[in-house]
Amino acid sequence: MALNKSTLEAHLEDLITDYYDLQFPSAFKLNEPPSPLEALRMISKSHPTVIRGYSPLREGVSREWRVPATYIELHGNGTEVAIAVTDDGLADSVRTLGSGETTFVKPLEERMSMTTFLSKLTANGGEALYLQSQDGNIYRSQPGMRGEPELASFQQVVERDVAWMRDAMGSTAVAVNLWIGNSRSTTSFHHDPYENVYHVLSGVKRFTLLSPVEGLCLEQHFQPPSTLVRGVDGELQPERDPEPAHPVPWVQSLVPPREVRPIIVELEEGDTLYLPADWWHKVEQEEGSGGLAVAVNYWYTSELRPERYALLRFAQRVARSAGREGVLDPDAGMDDDSGDIDDVMFSDGSVTSDDEWDPSEWGR
């Protein structure tokens, strides 16, 4: 006998209840960096973990990370960097236009010297600026990314890898990024397909975290993409991307659904967060005493576990059948020529997130 939508919805509610029966309600905490074996166990548990006592800086490096002068000294005044510019601090988000239509809006990208950027940032007025290039701007190992990373000058002070994470994963970080902003910049809910090690150098970062299971409660829809441009009056406004422009799946709401129990993590200077792959997160920040909120993060490829992959797709199909239109259809696009999981499977049967996603498209 076919199940009606109300029965399927009840099963989904039971799924969340069963999850909460066993899921720890807050982030795990480690008072010192894990060994590679402990890190492997941490990854296997796939639960956010706050780590204290770790530093991504090279041994013997001593800098005052709260002040702009440090970044100008390391990068040089003349070399320009790519800066995301918005009017509301939401670099990647869904907006409702005057016509009532919604669109996924990317920031205007402007190039400016590190000195100009930091001067405008610490003035804390006008438009919101964020250094968030996220394509491995310090280090990168992603095939197809050409040229030297934009912030390669920071390699003299930032380690190439998190040693215990590298040894646990058996691979080097696919991307290492520097993020510089202030309290005006925030993110909407999104998830990244990479194991993430995130360290705060200056200020405070506040993460609102939802597990992949809780992600079934989010309203995610495909949106036509737009990019902020300057109008004739100099004001920023979204402009639709030229064709062919592929719709972007994104969550519009900045507030967690009522039925979920988000984990809130507040990272202070010197704290590190291990954020498992595919956990949804919204990030807010506060600048430190020098007017800056700064972090370094490492993305590691995540092995796709067959049972988790299959069960999550099954849950998505159930959610769609129950009428949850905000859950993406896992079977959409399966008839095109983009290939399937067999196309990215290694000879040992393993599949990693590195085979399916480009880090430059994630994590803003």
Name what the model sees in each region.
Residues A2-T272, W279-R364:
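N-terminal accessory scaffold of Fe(II)-dependent oxygenases
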